[in-house]
Amino acid sequence: MGRPPKCRRVEFIPQCTYFKPAGIPLWNLEEVGLAVEEVEALRLKDLEGLEQEDCAERMGISRPTFQRILTGARSKVAQALVTGRAIRVEGGNFEYVARRLRCTGCRAEWEPDPSDLNEQQCPKCGGKELMTRPERCSRPKRGAGKYRVPKKR
């Protein structure tokens, strides 16, 4: 028996979850299901143009796993476009992680609007040189609380 799939990190939840070809009535329409993490893989690789290693790191998975997710997503989208099927985005094994940006000029931090995929700029100074704030580890540091400072005699 295989192990359960690892939970994937997702920074964007799509607001439009159903795409239908024009001219085909709903009762006569077949669907292709696309998981939320598959949409995230398409967004990171094809829309943001990141390298696979960076995409995999942001999703918290290995490169081969990212490649499998991306290949499956592209195959499903191509199948829907070629055969005239609807695309339904739902489900998957993921956790939503809000991404924070930091301006390199004024060091302001904010959470970008997930529906706005255009080029971001700092709301405080208008700067365009931004970086993603590094994730902070929620675990205590190694050895924290184990050592005591010896008392002076």
Curated annotation (Swiss-Prot):
Pfam families noted in UniProt: DUF134 (PF02001)
Gene3D superfamilies, A to Z: Winged helix-like DNA-binding domain superfamily/Winged helix DNA-binding domain (1.10.10.10)
Region Disordered: list its residue ranges: 129-153
Basic residues composition bias: residue spans:
139-153
Please name the SUPFAM superfamilies in this protein's record: Sigma3 and sigma4 domains of RNA polymerase sigma factors
Where do Basic and acidic residues bias regions lie?
129-138
Checking PANTHER family in the record gives: PTHR37478, UPF0251 PROTEIN TK0562
Entry similarity comment: Belongs to the UPF0251 family.
This protein is called UPF0251 protein Daud_0090
